[in-house]
Amino acid sequence: MKSAQSHKRYLRSIHKVQDYIEENLHTPFVLSELAEVAGFSKYHFHRIFSSITNETLLQYINRIKLERAAAFLIYRTELSITDIAYFFGFSDSAVFSRTFKNHYFISPKEYRNQKIKLARFAKTHPIYWCIIKIQ
């Protein structure tokens, strides 16, 4: 019973940290700060976070930043790739582009162009819209 209660507490703490990360994606994160949000020591937090999410903290933060940045590339076309890189806390556009390409296997510029072309095609060919929305 105690183990189940501990697990619930850990889950609540990790969800709290995940919410904190989501709300502060544009700022750099410090392990001690996130551990404090969770209410654990740095070592304990890092271990618990990895065991619950199956990702290291750095992997998780980068994945979330890249997912949000990918959405910005499509829906915030008025922003340059450099603006998006800085907004999500990358030191420069080269680091962002390299990290993005390692994750999506395509550069941010190619990703943006590909998705925009796909959206334009879907608008002119409504039959394909349901297929595109599923992806």
Regions found by a protein language model. Name each.
Residues 1-8, 74, 98-135:
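…primarily DNA-binding HTH/wHTH and HhH modules…
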Residues 1-6, 16, 28-64, 85-107:
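Basic/polar phosphate-binding segments, predominantly the helix-turn-helix DNA-binding elements
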Residues 15-32, 52-87, 115-134:
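Terminal helix-turn-helix DNA-binding modules in bacterial transcription factors
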